[in-house]
């Protein structure tokens, strides 16, 4: 029996169906892993931003910041004097249009229009806050008017303009680039540079970075809906992995993963996403992706069992046919021969039923693949494209925001790092570590998913009732789509982004290590001071015992003098330890700012590069699917 079973499994069609079933089983698990990885990555973005805000709230009072230097005005034409530079301390800059005064020089050229997504400078992004407001629409109208006015005045002009009364809500999310406190300079290459006129502390800068972490996380909401993440993630709690809860109630709320899902989430994003690109080829998504994959797996298991059963019937049928042939050659008894023939007919009937079951299962798989799976896959690619485009824009703005860190400096501080500050730094290190871990898992999950899907498609395109070399146009479409997707995922340079996050993790770990050294030095200083106070009290007691008029028994040994010498030595050591602690505090402050200044640009530049490549890769795959769908619609319209 075992030998017969082995012979059945060795059949090509059985082994093919077994491999198909195995690939689809992996696809079911890969889809679940992708959902979890996607959710955890979005959660990590929110958590890193929240941890940075909490960390900076403890660090900001220990730093002194200064305003950035005033930018020099653009070089004017020879006959025109340059406009006077603006004072860095001024809170607003008066703008006057060219129509209000003929004394002022003509206006400068307006900032260039926003470049395409592939550009490395997304100039207008810093002016776009997440929640739109009416005041910002007025600002855009004023900018458009100024642009039209300045178009005919030449490219070498310089001007100051005066806006209408600004409301408190008119400030940008990136407050350093606020409309009433900015200066735009234009060089010969027409590259607009925005310079902040406001001095900011670390807290304000980090809050802006956090806003775009939230924006990046919110961009994954439509894809979360497609992946049905709400039913996939169940391990939501307010506790960190170390099992600690922090005393600040606001911080506990920020670190609660449930709040990460709701904080700054825009409900309209999903509807905007669905209306963004239309429907590919007139198809609509039927059912959920999870349900579709599960049903495909159920049909693949049924198909495997039916094919395996059919092959066993074929083997029995061949044996019975051979038996009938031998009986006829031997001219055996009529009853035996007829019985064998009836067995053959029975097996043929069973084989016919089994073939119908195989065809039915195969048709159901094809139907699910055509009507549900392919439209869902196109929507997934569209969701990935939109998500990485938004993340590219968010990380690009963050790259510009963190440039303001170079305008911060530290002063020697005697204020030690508090325990809450140390805990917030440890939490930041943990969240950055989780960011790196979730990023690597997300990339791996995407690769495993498309690899399992492509492997299953490669085998499932084989038709049992057709020539295996013949493929329909639809089969070629879905297979070429997934192959292109597979190649795009393989070409993504995730190592660079991973190393960028690791470099930032190393910078944060350096701060943690320095704070730990400072804490140890503080303990040593406190211990030394405590010992000094104890010895000083003992010396005072000894001095009161041996008054100046009392004569010791032995003039060779004076206990007061010996004790005083020891106390003086201990005092020197205590002062030395105190000096070391103060120096350690200053080193901590300087290292904190230096590591942030060095680490932030690297990680955001790496993420900008990665998200840009992802955006372009998925856009290419999506556009290919869209063009194929449009071509097929055109063919349908041309056919009678």
UniProtKB/Swiss-Prot annotation:
<keyword id="KW-0175">Coiled coil</keyword>
<protein>
    <recommendedName>
        <fullName>Protein ALTERED PHOSPHATE STARVATION RESPONSE 1</fullName>
    </recommendedName>
</protein>
<feature type="region of interest" description="Disordered">
    <location>
        <begin position="60"/>
        <end position="175"/>
    </location>
</feature>
<feature type="compositionally biased region" description="Low complexity">
    <location>
        <begin position="88"/>
        <end position="103"/>
    </location>
</feature>
<dbReference type="InterPro" id="IPR006868">
    <property type="entry name" value="DUF630"/>
</dbReference>
<dbReference type="GO" id="GO:0005634">
    <property type="term" value="C:nucleus"/>
</dbReference>
<feature type="compositionally biased region" description="Pro residues">
    <location>
        <begin position="68"/>
        <end position="87"/>
    </location>
</feature>
<feature type="coiled-coil region">
    <location>
        <begin position="336"/>
        <end position="371"/>
    </location>
</feature>
<keyword id="KW-0539">Nucleus</keyword>
<comment type="function">
    <text>Required for the coordination of cell differentiation and cell elongation in the root tip. Required for the coordination of cell processes necessary for correct root growth in response to phosphate starvation, through the modulation of the auxin transporter protein PIN7.</text>
</comment>
<dbReference type="InterPro" id="IPR006867">
    <property type="entry name" value="DUF632"/>
</dbReference>
<dbReference type="Pfam" id="PF04782">
    <property type="entry name" value="DUF632"/>
</dbReference>
<feature type="compositionally biased region" description="Pro residues">
    <location>
        <begin position="104"/>
        <end position="118"/>
    </location>
</feature>
<dbReference type="Pfam" id="PF04783">
    <property type="entry name" value="DUF630"/>
</dbReference>
<feature type="compositionally biased region" description="Low complexity">
    <location>
        <begin position="144"/>
        <end position="173"/>
    </location>
</feature>
